[in-house]
C-alpha cells in the first residue's frame, strides 16, 4: 500500500514561505481601491448612458444592470471579509515527528507538518505566505480582495467572478445600444462617458470570462488553481467525485463548522459545545495504515464525506 504525501517534499510550493509576516496595509489599500473603482465606473455608467436610456423609456437597462451591480458589490464585499477556512494552531498538537494518516478514496495521505502554525495540516491545506495562515482546501490568494480563497469562501469567489462577467457584459451592451441610438445626436459628454465605460467593460470582460472558464473546469475535475506537482498523483485525483458531485460539494454542500484556537487544544465550534482535537484528528500510524472498512466513507466538503479531522 503506497502512502501518499500531500505536501513537501513531493509537492513543490509555488512561493517560499516568508521569514517575516508581509505588510498588510498596502494590500488592504489595494483591495479597498478596487471597491472604489467599481463604484466609480458604475456611477459614471448610471449617471450618463443608463440615465439617457431610462429618460427615453428604456427602463429594462437600469433595472437589469442595477440588479447585477448590487449582486457584484455584495459578493465583492462579502469576499473581502469572508473566512477562507483558517485552521489555527493548538498547543496540544504532537510534534513534527509524529505521523498522521488520513484516507481519501482508498488512498492514504501522510499529513505534513506546518512549521509556521505548528500542526499537521490536512490534505489540500496550504500555508498562505501573504496571510501567514493555514487555509483549509486552499485554492489561491486573491490580491484583488486581499484574502485567501479556500473551503469556506470559494462559492463567494465563484459568485463574484460570475456576477462581474454578467455585469461587465450588461454594461458593454447597454453602452453600445446607447451609442447606436444616439448616432443622430452631436457628440456629448454622455457619448464620451459611454465610450470610456464600454472600453473598460470590454477590457474587463475578456480576462474574467477566461478566469470563469478555468474555474469551472477546475471545479468539474475537483482540481485547484494552486496545485503542487506531485509525482505520485500524475493522472490521478482521489478527490474527484464526478462532475455533478464536485459542483454540489463546491457550491451547495454545507460548509461545516469553523475551527478556532484555544489555549490548550484545537476545538471545533458547534453552537455552545465543542469537540476536542483527538476527535477531529486522523488516527496515528501504524494503525492508520490499515485500510478502512468497506462501509467507511470518504471525506466531506470538496473532498467527500466526513473524514477523521
Swiss-Prot record:
Region: Disordered, residue numbers: 280-309
Membrane spanning stretches: 29-49, 59-79, 160-180, 193-213
Residue span(s) of domain DHHC: 112-162
Active site: 142 (s-palmitoyl cysteine intermediate)
One of the record's GO cellular component terms: perinuclear region of cytoplasm
Source domain of life: Eukaryota
Key words, A-Z: Acyltransferase, Cytoplasm, Golgi apparatus, Membrane, Transferase, Transmembrane, Transmembrane helix
Subcellular location as annotated: Golgi apparatus membrane; Cytoplasm, Perinuclear region
GO function terms (MF aspect): protein-cysteine S-palmitoyltransferase activity
Reported impact of residue 142 to S: Abolishes palmitoyltransferase activity
UniProt record, GO biological process: peptidyl-L-cysteine S-palmitoylation; positive regulation of aggrephagy; protein targeting to membrane
Domain notes: The DHHC domain is required for palmitoyltransferase activity.
Enzyme Commission number(s) of this protein: 2.3.1.225
Organism from which the protein derives: Homo sapiens
Pfam short name (any one): DHHC
Protein topology in the membrane: Multi-pass membrane protein
Function: Palmitoyltransferase that mediates palmitoylation oproteins, such as RRAS and SQSTM1. Catalyzes palmitoylation of RRAS, leading to increased cell viability. Acts as a positive regulator of autophagy by mediating palmitoylation of SQSTM1, promoting affinity between SQSTM1 and ATG8 proteins and recruitment of ubiquitinated cargo proteins to autophagosomes. (Microbial infection) Promotes Chikungunya virus (CHIKV) replication by mediating viral nsp1 palmitoylation.
Biased segments, Pro residues type: 280-294
Catalytic EC class: transferase
Taxon lineage: Eukaryota, Metazoa, Chordata, Craniata, Vertebrata
Protein's UniProt keywords contain Transferase: yes
Catalysed reaction equations from the record: L-cysteinyl-[protein] + hexadecanoyl-CoA = S-hexadecanoyl-L-cysteinyl-[protein] + CoA
Protein name, as recorded: Palmitoyltransferase ZDHHC19
PANTHER family referenced in this protein's UniProt entry, alphabetically: PALMITOYLTRANSFERASE ZDHHC19, ZINC FINGER DHHC DOMAIN CONTAINING PROTEIN
